[in-house]
UniProtKB/Swiss-Prot annotation:
Record annotation: effect of changing residue 244 to A: Lethal. Complete loss of procapsids assembly
UniProt KW Transmembrane helix keyword: no
Key words of the record: Capsid protein, Late protein, T=7 icosahedral capsid protein, Virion
Designated gene of the protein: 5
Protein name in UniProt: Major capsid protein
Effect on the protein upon substituting residue 377 to A: No effect on phage growth
Cross-referenced InterPro entries: Phage_coat_Gp5 (IPR024659)
């Protein structure tokens, strides 16, 4: 029996929600946020959100004239344009309703793919915690465990907030190589049947809550930059605002810093770098770690300037106020002629990891229920597990006995805490 219009719409929306929910593991490990609609309309779909505050403390009985200020930093998050599947059907295309439903399922799979690609690319390009190995995974015994454990070690040592959980995503090739090391065995060392059947690696590997895989992870091509140094001594401060041309306060995005170099030839977005002698700090204890501080190139500005993340705030910068020093994340400022180390020296398909609130999916319902759109039929839906909102819309044309169908998702993927997003690159031998 043929389905009526209401049943077709219900089935279509259910198909979209179920399909996208089933194949978006990366997006489901991100934080979700629905911003207020009216304010987004007046701000070009950008909203400023606070990041975790850092507080300076001090000992003593008498703290007269020692009060510190409140410094709350912000990051800009935004939504892009809707992602759509827009197609036309004629009456004779609907004689077999299952063909229509298969098209809906196909659209949902493609839209889910696009979400996962955006998360994967954002993590690979913005991830600033960099774990490299000179060997490919699987070269030595237990090197897969060490590779993942190194990532967890730096997150733990940096004292990064991990209250929402942590996740690690291998690319398929490295997942296959790592599986033998990381799959849970019984007391006799036997690998369970499930590991062969569905590629399952146990949960809570090397401190990560979930270790998964994704075929969406991009290749980070090697950087061809060589012999680059810092040009001039440079230091950076965390600031909540700056004054515009009219003397009014405007927010500052503290994820980024513009660094002056001797040259930028061969550098590109996503390159991973470090500076000689610049070490990470534990965020709370402010102890200097053994690991070099690592950064991601966000943008090549011109022949001598690059924008990097995170902003390096130096503990030894005497010009910092107490509340600014609480945000210090490296031991020392950038010095003139300091060597810049390129970390991605070989092409490699990325592995990525993050604290689960480091990436944020921002989405809003599409307001298509206004009377201006009375000529079409729309059904709004949300996908809570993925944090997405969308519409299923149809419109018929009596002159051609055809109808248009549009499935749209409106969202943006944002790296709100790039300091808590990392990239694993094996095989990095120059």
């Amino acid at each position: 029996m043929a389905l009526n219009e209401g049943q077709i719409v219900t089935l279509a929306v259910d198909e979209i929600i179920e399909t996208i929910s089933a194949i978006t593991p990366m997006a489901q490990k991100a934080k979700k946020y629905t911003p207020p609609a009216a304010s987004m309309q007046r701000s070009s779909n950008t909203i400023w959100m606070p990041v975790e505050q850092e507080s300076p403390t001090q000992e003593g009985w008498d703290l007269t004239d020692k009060a510190t200020g409140l410094l709350e930093l912000n990051v800009a998050v935004n939504m892009g344009e809707p992602d759509n599947d827009f197609f036309q059907l004629r009456a004779d295309d609907l004689r077999d309703e299952t063909a229509y439903r298969r098209r809906i399922q196909s659209a949902a799979r493609k839209l889910a793919n696009n979400v996962e690609l955006k998360v994967a690319n954002m993590a690979a390009e913005m991830g600033s915690l960099v774990i490299t190995s000179p060997d490919a995974i699987g070269t030595n015994t237990a090197d897969a465990w060490n590779f993942v454990a190194d990532a967890e070690e730096i997150m733990f040592s940096r004292e990064l907030n991990r209250d929402m959980g942590t996740s690690y995503f291998f690319n398929p090739q490295d997942y296959k190589k790592a599986g033998y090391d990381l799959t849970k065995r019984d007391i006799f060392g036997r690998i369970p049947e499930e590991a062969y059947r569905d590629g399952t690696i146990q949960r809570q590997v090397a401190g990560f809550d979930d270790v998964l895989r994704s075929p969406k992870l991009p290749v980070l091509t090697k950087s061809t930059a060589t012999g680059i140094t810092v040009s001039g001594a440079q230091s950076f401060k965390p600031v909540a605002w700056q004054l515009d041309n009219d003397g009014n306060k405007v927010n500052v995005d503290n994820r980024f810093a513009t660094v002056t170099l001797s040259a930028t030839t061969g550098m590109k977005r996503g390159d991973k770098i470090s500076f000689a002698g610049v070490k990470f700090l534990g965020q709370m204890a402010k102890n200097v770690l053994a690991q070099d501080a690592t950064f991601s190139v966000v943008r090549v500005v011109d022949g001598t300037h690059v924008e990097i993340t995170p902003k390096p705030v130096a503990l030894d910068d005497v010009s910092l106020s107490p509340e600014q020093r609480a945000y210090a994340n490296v031991n020392t400022s950038l010095a003139d002629a300091m060597a810049v180390n390129i970390l991605n020296v070989k092409d490699a398909r990325t592995n990525v990891f993050w604290a689960d609130d480091a990436i944020r999916i921002v989405s809003q319902p599409i307001p298509a229920n206004h009377e201006l759109f009375a000529g079409m039929k729309t059904t709004s839906f949300s996908i809570p597990d993925v944090g997405l909102n969308g519409i299923f819309a149809t419109q018929g044309d009596i002159s051609t006995l055809s109808g248009l169908c549009r499935i749209a998702l409106w969202y943006g993927v944002n790296a709100t805490r790039p300091e808590a997003i990392g990239v694993g690159l094996p095989g990095q031998t120059a």
